Structures are given as structure tokens and as C-alpha cells.
Amino acid sequence: MAIGMSELKKGLKIEIDGIPYRITEYQHVKPGKGAAFVRAKIKSFLDGKVIEKTFHAGDKCEEPNLQEKTMQFLYHDGGAFQFMDTTTYEQIALSDDQVGDVAKWIIDGLNVQILFHNEKAISVDVPLVVELTITETAPNFKGDTSSGGKKPATLETGAVVQVPFHVLEGEKIKVNTETGEYLEKVK
């Protein structure tokens, strides 16, 4: 199905020359002279590159053949992440490169969204908030308060986040996966 210029918006998935993209920024421009156009930044699902594209009044884009599946992370074996489809129990292996930066938030049993383009896995999305255990951080000192500064903490996945001084090794915390920021202790 063709997508017209007036339908473009942030987050929309489009296909140009057989490559699926997501619109990350969108600006409708109406110059004093001439026809209006849309300037957009689009990110490729295949290689992650961001390009700027201008769409003019009669331009059309195709809707990509994308399918999203909920899959559960099983284990990591030397360069490949193993996932299982939660409905069909079919298993797939994705390389470290295919999983990308979100690997630092993935723990055993975590359900993720995997996006497929023409039956090929192209991206992995983790939940916005994950609960992880702190494996290493500096000990508390007298006078450390919850409103004080921050200290680095290594999580069970190897990711390092800044946490308040009162947070201890072995505690479970919630982390925002988009920003990598500490949110709160798990109660």
C-alpha cells in the first residue's frame, strides 16, 4: 500500500528502494513560494544509518513488509543470542551485531520484540524498563543519602549505570533502556 506525503509522521515505517526505514524526525515545510514539502530523518532498519530525505507533494512511499513477533531470550552462546517464539516455540539465533546495543539489557527469560522484514530478523526491541541486579558497586559511606550524588554500578549484564549512593550491591533496580538511567529500586 502506498503512503502519501500527508500521512508521514514520526515513528512511521516506510520502504524506499526495497529498504525499510523508520521516520525519526519530521518537519512539514511551507515556503513562501512553491509547493510545501516534508523534510524527514529516516533510520534504516538494516544498518542503522540515518539519512535526511525530502518528500514533495505527489511523492509516495511503500509500506514495508514487516512482522513483529514477541520472543523470549533463552541464552547467549559465544556470538549468538538464542530466542524462542512464545507462540510457536520456534527458535532462532541472532548474531551480536544483529542484536546491537540492546544486548546490555537482555537477561534470561526476557520477552523482546523482534522485527522481521521479508522473514529476516532486522531489529530487536527490549521493554522500556527492565529489572536488573547490581553485581558490583562501591560500598556506602556514612553520610550517603538518597538525594546525594551518584556512583557507577555494574549490572548482571555487564552494563554500567549511575545509581544513588544508597543503592547497594546485590539489589535489584529498574533501568530505562532508552536512556540507560536508574529509575528506582525494585521493592
Swiss-Prot record:
Q: Which family does it belong to?
A: Belongs to the elongation factor P family.
Please report the name of this protein according to its UniProt entry. Elongation factor P
Q: Briefly state the protein's biological role.
A: Involved in peptide bond synthesis. Stimulates efficient translation and peptide-bond synthesis on native or reconstituted 70S ribosomes in vitro. Probably functions indirectly by altering the affinity of the ribosome for aminoacyl-tRNA, thus increasing their reactivity as acceptors for peptidyl transferase.
Q: What is the lineage of its organism?
A: Bacteria, Pseudomonadati, Campylobacterota, Epsilonproteobacteria, Campylobacterales
Subcellular location per UniProt equals: Cytoplasm
| Keywords tagged on the record | Cytoplasm, Elongation factor, Protein biosynthesis
What InterPro entries is this protein classified in? Elong-fact-P_C, NA-bd_OB-fold, Rib_uL2_dom2, Transl_elong_fac_P/YeiP, Transl_elong_KOW-like, Transl_elong_P/YeiP_cen, Transl_elong_P/YeiP_CS, Transl_elongation_fac_P
Q: Name one GO cellular component term.
A: cytoplasm
> CDD domains, per this entry?
S1_EF-P_repeat_1, S1_EF-P_repeat_2
Pathway recorded for this protein: Protein biosynthesis; polypeptide chain elongation
Keyword Protein biosynthesis found: yes
* Predominant location category: cytoplasm
List GO molecular-function terms, semicolon-separated.
translation elongation factor activity
Per the record, the GO terms for biological process are: peptide biosynthetic process
Source organism per UniProt: Helicobacter hepaticus (strain ATCC 51449 / 3B1)
Stored Pfam families: EFP (PF01132), EFP_N (PF08207), Elong-fact-P_C (PF09285)
